[in-house]
Amino acid sequence: MASIMEGPLCKWTNVMKGWQYRWFVLDYNAGLLSYYTSNDKMMRGSRRGCVRLRGAVIGIDDEDDSTFTITVDQKTFHFQARDADEREKWIHALEETILRHTLQLQGLDSGFVPSVQDFDKKLTEADAYLQILIEQLKLFDDKLQNCKEDEQRKKIETLKETTNSMVESIKHCIVLLQIAKDQSNAEKHADGMISTINPVDAIYQPSPLEPVISTMPSQTVLPPEPVQLCKSEQRPSSLPVGPVLATLGHHQTPTPNSTGSGHSPPTSSLTSPSHVNLSPNTVPEFSYSSSEDEFYDADEFHQSGSSPKRLIDSSGSASVLTHSSSGNSLKRPDTTESLNSSMSNGTSGADLFDSHDDRDDDAEAGSVEEHKSVIMHLLSQVRLGMDLTKVVLPTFILERRSLLEMYADFFAHPDLFVSISDQKDPKDRMVQVVKWYLSAFHAGRKGSVAKKPYNPILGEIFQCYWTLPNDTEENTELVSEGPVPWVSKNSVTFVAEQVSHHPPISAFYAECFNKKIQFNAHIWTKSKFLGMSIGVHNIGQGCVSCLDYDEHYILTFPNGYGRSIFTVPWVELGGECNINCSKTGYSANIIFHTKPFYGGKKHRITAEIFSPNDKKSFCSVEGEWNGVMYAKYATGENTVFVDTKKLPIIKKKVRKLEDQNEYESRSLWKDVTFNLKIRDIDAATEAKHRLEERQRAEARERKEKEIQWETRLFHEDGECWVYDEPLLKRLGAAKH
């Protein structure tokens, strides 16, 4: 990679309350992103400010393809490229720079000082692997002799040629590395501790003592011994052994003209030392601007007990990931709270409801902060936009419940749900559906710290029910054929099942027999890494069915985002959702607004409800999905639509643990939940690992026996997952 990349970007400033054009120079070797008001100012060395990249984190917005952020030194700087392609170029270059300097910091902090002997050892290992590969090459000849089909023979020959070419390249690389080692032995410095980093206003200046190996391609510069290599286990193969620089001559590389009216693509080029006025100053200790008017999210760290400016644990990643190295490095102090207080959920009396709902996770805010280095190690292995479905997350960030149980929180206001069928007019029923829908999200998160629920095991089930506020003890007739057969017909019952593991799909169903209303949904969760955030796309749909009116309201779900994942995480929702009733023609458009990079409020929603064939809505709703939402009707009436602060949350009721089947959520996860409760992270991790291994073993057994997995309560119908015995089907059968 070139030592310097430069070009125009826009940078947000608070003074102007908007974007300002700046000329940026990325110095790969110094780990510095400097910016100037123009190209001319850059050539004169008049730097406006700089961003240190060691330990920095890049963030992107899933809904905006041109902006990105760099978070470092307790500040978040906001940038805007011309388009998605230009942003991708900058992000790729910045990621490589950050990774290089962060890995160097890891190596230095852990006390590891690489030597030529370490280099030689790795060369020997590489040569041994090469010999194994050469032996494997001989198998191609056997394959060709036994191959009868011409088409298959051509494929094998092509693969053999490609492999031969790769082997030759590896041979060449090993020879060049050997030459570099020999040259280093001959010319290395006496003290072996001279640093190559001479940071200046814009570019990296090689040390005059640094040897240039003329026999190597592109005239590779071999760095001094202490920083020439990181631990081989930590350095990705895509990174060079040392900084690769072309010999700096007296010519200048042309750069884009800063006087142009529009953006031009960033130019990656090597620049001569005469290109700018060099400064003897070292890299600034902190990122800075000539005036602190830049937009950054200073409040992102105000809840954090320690400064996030050093994102790598001083003990190095190796010691952090070895839980047993210090005995209790990841354990939390014991608590006197018993398992029963958090998990026992009876079937009668005052102990009926779920005490999980009364938990307060605020006290656990520190766990994410104290294990930040583990998260940093984990996220150093992923790239922006990468699918996180198969990435194993550390146990301490888990919430003490399954994702299936979290979906039950859609019905934390069951009275609003069943009142849909009480409305006599189709217009009022649509308004009530929207009201219930907008009230359904806030109950899922009561603590201030966002955590991730357990990934359900294939075939896992969760069952619960709610007693309506005005329900009396006289309504004792049970729904024997319903999803929760031990409750009365006036209750709202809920059941969920993990119907697929790859992709992860959950299906859930709820009903109220007496109100003749049911709900069926399926959600496929797809996670994506966004730098400072994790995005979860909820792919799927739900259907509210009012059976007395033969109406079906199809709805979609917003995406979820875990923000500030390196400090105190918080959750927001984002995306456009729709609710449609094909029979009546009523519809609603709902937008969950994510907090913009530059100002704005969190958790905003706007909604429009439309009559059949009308392009203008008869009701507009705006507010916060976890706060107060206001409705404005076409008649001029203004009213509170939903006030989640005043709405009482009705507790769900779950069978006692000892009464549950083995595959029910709380029974499956009881060991993980208990150990998370007492903050024994090692034991929780081990319990989680046992569950996952059992699931893998069962999958292998089914594959060997060629057996298809059979779901318990749901079946696939086209692209949807439908409950086997919904209320609609049971009522229809009863009529015949």
UniProtKB/Swiss-Prot annotation:
<dbReference type="GO" id="GO:0032934">
    <property type="term" value="F:sterol binding"/>
</dbReference>
<dbReference type="InterPro" id="IPR037239">
    <property type="entry name" value="OSBP_sf"/>
</dbReference>
<keyword id="KW-0446">Lipid-binding</keyword>
<keyword id="KW-0813">Transport</keyword>
<protein>
    <recommendedName>
        <fullName>Oxysterol-binding protein-related protein 9</fullName>
    </recommendedName>
</protein>
<comment type="subunit">
    <text>Heterodimer with OSBPL11. Interacts with OSBPL10.</text>
</comment>
<feature type="compositionally biased region" description="Low complexity">
    <location>
        <begin position="253"/>
        <end position="275"/>
    </location>
</feature>
<dbReference type="GO" id="GO:0006869">
    <property type="term" value="P:lipid transport"/>
</dbReference>
<dbReference type="Pfam" id="PF01237">
    <property type="entry name" value="Oxysterol_BP"/>
</dbReference>
<comment type="function">
    <text>Interacts with OSBPL11 to function as lipid transfer proteins. Together they form a heterodimer that localizes at the ER-trans-Golgi membrane contact sites, and exchanges phosphatidylserine (1,2-diacyl-sn-glycero-3-phospho-L-serine, PS) for phosphatidylinositol-4-phosphate (1,2-diacyl-sn-glycero-3-phospho-(1D-myo-inositol 4-phosphate), PI(4)P) between the two organelles, a step that is critical for sphingomyelin synthesis in the Golgi complex.</text>
</comment>
<keyword id="KW-0445">Lipid transport</keyword>
<feature type="compositionally biased region" description="Polar residues">
    <location>
        <begin position="336"/>
        <end position="348"/>
    </location>
</feature>
<dbReference type="Pfam" id="PF00169">
    <property type="entry name" value="PH"/>
</dbReference>
<keyword id="KW-0597">Phosphoprotein</keyword>
<feature type="domain" description="PH">
    <location>
        <begin position="2"/>
        <end position="99"/>
    </location>
</feature>
<comment type="similarity">
    <text>Belongs to the OSBP family.</text>
</comment>
<keyword id="KW-0007">Acetylation</keyword>
<feature type="modified residue" description="Phosphoserine">
    <location>
        <position position="329"/>
    </location>
</feature>
<dbReference type="GO" id="GO:0005794">
    <property type="term" value="C:Golgi apparatus"/>
</dbReference>
<feature type="region of interest" description="Disordered">
    <location>
        <begin position="231"/>
        <end position="368"/>
    </location>
</feature>
<feature type="modified residue" description="N-acetylalanine">
    <location>
        <position position="2"/>
    </location>
</feature>
<feature type="modified residue" description="Phosphoserine">
    <location>
        <position position="324"/>
    </location>
</feature>
<dbReference type="InterPro" id="IPR018494">
    <property type="entry name" value="Oxysterol-bd_CS"/>
</dbReference>
<dbReference type="InterPro" id="IPR001849">
    <property type="entry name" value="PH_domain"/>
</dbReference>
<feature type="compositionally biased region" description="Polar residues">
    <location>
        <begin position="314"/>
        <end position="329"/>
    </location>
</feature>
<feature type="modified residue" description="Phosphoserine">
    <location>
        <position position="306"/>
    </location>
</feature>
<dbReference type="InterPro" id="IPR011993">
    <property type="entry name" value="PH-like_dom_sf"/>
</dbReference>
<keyword id="KW-0472">Membrane</keyword>
<feature type="modified residue" description="Phosphoserine">
    <location>
        <position position="325"/>
    </location>
</feature>
<dbReference type="GO" id="GO:0005829">
    <property type="term" value="C:cytosol"/>
</dbReference>
<feature type="modified residue" description="Phosphoserine">
    <location>
        <position position="611"/>
    </location>
</feature>
<keyword id="KW-0333">Golgi apparatus</keyword>
<feature type="modified residue" description="Phosphoserine">
    <location>
        <position position="326"/>
    </location>
</feature>
<dbReference type="InterPro" id="IPR000648">
    <property type="entry name" value="Oxysterol-bd"/>
</dbReference>
<dbReference type="GO" id="GO:0031902">
    <property type="term" value="C:late endosome membrane"/>
</dbReference>
<keyword id="KW-0967">Endosome</keyword>
